[in-house]
């Protein structure tokens, strides 16, 4: 009943209006899995390759017909007849057939779409929700938790057309007792922030991930307006709501210095930028900082981990790119204490689960994440619950591509009840 009988790839549109790959995997018995690959804007240099056509006459070169052709041709031929329940085998077949270190022959976007679609089809054939199937693949059947959301309510950097350097300013509703309550709290702060920004004559247009993208006097001002909104919404900063940031520092790393336009083009060394961030953590209850330095600045990261690693969560995104080889090196060298998990950085479900396991086994936390280019595909919600990862980043309280994930989490929490606890701040490293 779980034998693959047909695989279909197609080019669809993501939340930025760019093409991406969608795959359908059909099994005996009529079971079907449908999944789409996301796409990043600020990308780590060591990510698996997202294959684009490069034909400027079509979608400005961003078409994915080559990746779709790989799905409909060699990938389909290789996996038809195979058992979709054997996820590791399906993924290995595709990876081996691609034969490159970074999936550049078929594209990580092609391989991932089929990998996730196969998992969804297998779950359907077993009569299980996707999160339950993922828990079984993870070797942790029946072990679930609801993730603490990091809600990106002010967008900067590569995710917005404004003068804010730091890419994401996030709130975490740690005072909530349930995921559903956390979403309500986040929504209330999000709408209150709009009023605060309007009262200051600032714009409330949103960026790629649904957060506001105003021009601000400095990076610290983003934290100040969020603090004002939290209070105006009736919550206590540090008790009900904590803060998190994604610096995406590789985006403003130039000639060995961190150059911040929002700070008057001031240039910082690794140590100076670490202390700049440390000062912000003393002013505001920031409990998590992602990519606080450039992905190649491992000496700087070692220093940053020494200074901040016992106090807050330091998440590696561009730093680790969901890659177990790189993560292993980071663990051995004591770099950061958490990993951001993005399916398409590595390109298959099996490799994603391996990265989560390696992180947890080493005492690192794992934060499940969307990309700035998303679709209505909500698989990351099931991944977060099915691996009991504990934390999720899936944008703000607007844009259907973001809200789709929150709504799926609401459904899952309703289905699982007490068997999927919401642990709040306990999930965050250092808290």
Swiss-Prot record:
Is Membrane one of the keywords UniProt gives this record?
no
Signal sequence interval, chain numbering: none
Keywords of this entry: Cytoplasm, Glycolysis, Lyase, Magnesium, Metal-binding, Secreted
Question: Which cofactors are required for activity?
Answer: Mg(2+)
For this protein, the record's InterPro entries field holds: Enolase, Enolase-like_C_sf, Enolase-like_N, Enolase_C, Enolase_CS, Enolase_N
Taking the first listed entry, what is the main subcellular location of this protein, grouped into a coarse class? cytoplasm
Provide the binding site for (2R)-2-phosphoglycerate. 167, 342, 371-372, 393
**Where found?**
Cytoplasm; Secreted; Cell surface
Coiled-coil spans are none
What are the GO MF terms of this UniProt record?
magnesium ion binding; phosphopyruvate hydratase activity
Report quaternary structure and partners: Component of the RNA degradosome, a multiprotein complex involved in RNA processing and mRNA degradation.
| UniProt xrefs under HAMAP family | Enolase
User: Would you tell me the protein name for this molecule?
Assistant: Enolase
Species of origin reads: Pectobacterium carotovorum subsp. carotovorum (strain PC1)
- Which gene carries the instructions for this protein? eno
């Amino acid at each position: 009943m779980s034998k693959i009988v047909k695989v279909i790839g197609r080019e669809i549109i993501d939340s930025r209006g760019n093409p991406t790959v969608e795959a359908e995997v059909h099994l005996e018995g009529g079971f079907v899995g449908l999944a789409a690959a996301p796409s990043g804007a600020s990308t780590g240099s060591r990510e698996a390759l997202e294959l684009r056509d490069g034909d400027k006459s079509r979608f400005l070169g961003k078409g994915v017909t080559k990746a779709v052709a790989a799905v409909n041709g060699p990938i389909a031929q290789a996996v038809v007849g195979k058992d979709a329940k054997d996820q590791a085998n399906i993924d290995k077949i595709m990876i081996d057939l691609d034969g490159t270190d970074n999936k550049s022959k078929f594209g990580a976007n092609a391989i991932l779409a089929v990998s996730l679609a196969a998992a969804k089809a297998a779950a359907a054939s077993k009569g299980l929700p996707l999160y339950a199937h993922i828990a079984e693949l993870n070797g942790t059947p029946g072990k679930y938790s609801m993730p603490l959301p990091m809600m990106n309510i002010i967008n900067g950097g590569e995710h917005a057309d404004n003068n804010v350097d730091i890419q994401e300013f996030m709130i975490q509703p740690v005072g909530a007792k349930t995921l559903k309550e956390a979403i309500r709290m986040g929504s209330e702060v999000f709408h209150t922030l709009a009023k605060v920004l309007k009262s200051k004559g600032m714009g409330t247009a949103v960026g790629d991930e649904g957060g506001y993208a105003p021009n601000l006097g400095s990076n610290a001002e983003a934290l100040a307006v969020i603090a004002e909104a939290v209070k105006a919404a009736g919550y206590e900063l540090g008790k009900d709501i904590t803060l998190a940031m994604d610096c995406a520092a590789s985006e403003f790393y130039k000639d060995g210095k961190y150059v911040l336009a929002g700070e008057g083009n001031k240039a910082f060394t690794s140590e100076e930028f670490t202390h700049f961030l440390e000062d912000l953590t003393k002013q505001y209850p920031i409990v998590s900082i992602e990519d606080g330095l450039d992905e190649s600045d491992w000496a700087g990261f070692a220093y940053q981990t020494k200074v901040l690693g016992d106090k807050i969560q330091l998440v590696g995104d561009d730093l680790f790119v969901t890659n177990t080889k790189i993560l292993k090196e980071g663990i051995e060298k004591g770099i950061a204490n958490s990993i951001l998990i993005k399916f398409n950085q590595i390109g298959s479900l099996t490799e994603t689960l391996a990265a989560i396991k390696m992180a947890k086994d080493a005492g690192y936390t794992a934060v499940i994440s969307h990309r700035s280019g998303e679709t209505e595909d909500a698989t990351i919600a099931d991944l977060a619950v099915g691996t009991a990862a504990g934390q999720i980043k899936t944008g703000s309280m607007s844009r259907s591509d973001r809200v789709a994930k929150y709504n799926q989490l609401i459904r899952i929490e309703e289905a699982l009840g007490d068997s999927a606890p919401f642990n709040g701040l306990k999930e965050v490293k250092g808290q």
